[in-house]
From Swiss-Prot:
Gene: rpsN
Keyword Electron transport set for record: no
Lineage: Bacteria, Pseudomonadati, Pseudomonadota, Alphaproteobacteria, Hyphomonadales
NCBIfam families: PRK08881.1
GO molecular function: rRNA binding; structural constituent of ribosome
Role: Binds 16S rRNA, required for the assembly of 30S particles and may also be responsible for determining the conformation of the 16S rRNA at the A site.
UniProt family annotation: Belongs to the universal ribosomal protein uS14 family.
Organism in which the protein naturally occurs: Hyphomonas neptunium (strain ATCC 15444)
Quaternary assembly: Part of the 30S ribosomal subunit. Contacts proteins S3 and S10.
Protein name in UniProt: Small ribosomal subunit protein uS14
Length: 101
């Protein structure tokens, strides 16, 4: 089980990323728009830099929904390899059969 503080920090990052997503997209579009003057584009970049760092979506870490483990994460199932193996052995993952020989 991961530290609760790390899981909560990641949840805060998810919330911040969702809250600032529209504003960030608007500023990025303005910064990349070649029809605007260089000065306006630069202002958009400065505004983008003023946003909280944790509002960037790439700072959000994929974590297992069950254990909170940050590594060996299966996106499709939203769980780590360890949780997947455990749940698969119990037959709780539809379509998954754990092989044994």
């Amino acid at each position: 089980m991961a530290k609760k503080s790390a899981i909560e920090k990641n949840n805060r990052r998810k919330a911040l990323a969702a809250r600032y997503a529209a504003k960030r997209a608007q500023l990025k579009a303005a910064a990349m728009d070649e029809n605007l003057s260089l000065e306006e584009r630069f202002k958009a970049r400065l505004k983008l830099a003023e946003l909280p760092r944790n509002s960037a979506p790439n700072r959000v870490r994929n974590r297992c929904e069950i254990t909170g483990r940050p590594r060996a994460f299966y996106r499709k199932l939203k769980m780590s390899r360890i949780a997947l193996r455990e749940y698969g052995s119990r037959g709780q993952v539809p379509g998954l059969v754990k092989s044994s020989w």
